[in-house]
Amino acid sequence: MTYREVLENAKKSILNCKACPECNGLGCGNTLPGPGSKAPGNGAHDNWAAWKSIRLNFDTFVEDGPTDTSCTLFGREFSLPLLSGPIGSMTQYSKEDVTVAFNDGVMEGSAAAGTIDCFGDGLAPGVLPGALESIARHHAAAIPVFNPLPNASIMRNMDMFEDSDALAVCVVVDSAGLSHWKQSDFKPGAKTVADLQLLRAHTKKPFLVKGIMTAKGARQAVEAGADGIIVSNHGGRALADVPGTAEVLPEIVDAVKGKTTIIVDGGIRHGVDMVKALAIGADAVLICRPFAVAWFGGGAEGVKTYIELLKKEFSEAMYMVGARKVRDLNPEMLRFPGSGYKR
């Protein structure tokens, strides 16, 4: 199966998404419910454009040899520094709630490709039990991502995965203001450092916090004991006119690099984007919307096809900037906006 075939197949069944060849936020705008951004709908595109504004520097004056895209995250080795992102409810893409099947397919495809899958806690009662079964079925390196519900609710959900093979657990704070959550009976809300410390203490697994967009927030997550942070503005879905994640990543790297694992999402669509993120200082990237397209377009095989495309692009870009291993990537391989040569 080719990625072109995946896109064509997805267009036949996916709703509220055009399965665009380039997932840059322009096609979906502020389509909510659906894959769009918070009105006026510029957030997803701003994320994408921020990565595109960064250029790669050629460097072939290095020792020749193959590239190694593998990495170690949370004590395990993976084929690629990539996480597939969580989608709590697939009703925004389908007339039926196919969230359990989606989670299962993405876990299967990710496990086959040697990468990590993150899945949402969802609104339906069967989502988390289904994910628990999928982790065991596919021996998946998977991370449940819990919305900012009352602490007692999060801890009950965390308990489901404590004795499982889940790689880590994650609490997302950037969804606290989503309108559909505010209108629900789940009582989501903001979290303090003390809240996160309480949740950190509740599990023996690596603990991640998603929704970091400032150096201050990154330092607070580290203070709370986070083993990893995900730099994210919820794909532009929570607040309009926020910076793109590529714009804030450098200051966050400067603040907490070496103190916690840094993962970044938002508008990352290609292997070249992955090179940019890791050269700035991220340890891995997370990609979300395209995995919905990949699953609708080919199930687990479509997911694996997309990951293999990313790996090929990532490897080729690494080679041309002079990196042979992931750890070789560094800021000197990048050209940032406004950094052009001046006499």
Language model features: what each stretch is:
Residues 102-150:
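A gly/proline- and charged-residue-enriched helix-loop-helix capping module
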Residues 2-78, 338-343:
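An N-cap/entry alpha-helix motif that binds or orients negatively charged groups
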Residues 51-58, 114, 162-165, 173, ...:
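Structural signal for hydrophobic packing residues in well-ordered secondary-structure cores
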Residues 108, 137, 149-264, 271-294, ...:
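Alpha/beta enzyme core
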Residues 66-71, 129, 153-159:
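Short alpha-helical segments and helix-capping/turn motifs at coil-helix boundaries
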